[in-house]
Amino acid sequence: MLITKIVGHIDDYESSDKKVDWLEVEWEDLNKRILRKETENGTDIAIKLENSGTLRYGDVLYESDDTLIAIRTKLEKVYVIKPQTMQEMGKMAFEIGNRHTMCIIEDDEILVRYDKTLEKLIDEVGVSYEQSERRFKEPFKYRGHQH
């Protein structure tokens, strides 16, 4: 099945009794306009978005009378970092950026992929954190630069 545009968002179908056939992708795949994968139920999907937009968790790619095909990211081990002050946020953001570690800020939390070497760094900064499993909902926005 060829998909050239997003037809909606899963939140718009909360009251619907349509079945959702998830197309599970890697976090990095959200930045891609062209992608080929199979849904959980085995439907072959070829995505070739016409515009230059990105995919997002919950995007509905296809709708029939009884089924939706929607995007979701894989469940990943993450550190949920919870700065309590602006100083903690600044220190942690500096350290994460200095390592070129991808992160997402959601509400008052910083989410980074699990990496055992980060534990020591987070402990040194003194910020509270926990290990958890989450799905990244936003594509990482790359900002290219040179040193």
Curated annotation (Swiss-Prot):
Lineage of the organism: Bacteria, Bacillati, Bacillota, Bacilli, Bacillales
Entry annotated with the keyword Zinc: yes
Biological process terms in GO annotation: protein folding; protein-containing complex assembly; urea metabolic process
Subunit structure comment from the entry: Homodimer in diluted solutions, homotetramer in concentrated solutions and when bound to Ni(2+) or Zn(2+). The homodimer is thought to be the active form.
Compartment(s) where it occurs, according to its Swiss-Prot or TrEMBL record: Cytoplasm
Record keyword Metal-binding present: yes
Binding residue positions for Ni(2+): 100
Family membership: Belongs to the UreE family.
Gene Ontology cellular-component annotations: cytoplasm
Gene for this chain: ureE
Cofactor(s) this protein requires: Zn(2+); Ni(2+)
Single Gene Ontology MF annotation: nickel cation binding
Keyword tags: Chaperone, Cytoplasm, Metal-binding, Nickel, Nickel insertion, Zinc
Protein known as: Urease accessory protein UreE
Functional summary from the UniProt entry: Involved in urease metallocenter assembly. Binds nickel. Probably functions as a nickel donor during metallocenter assembly.
Cofactor binding annotation: Binds 1 Zn(2+) or 1 Ni(2+) ion per dimer or tetramer.
Subcellular location, principal: cytoplasm
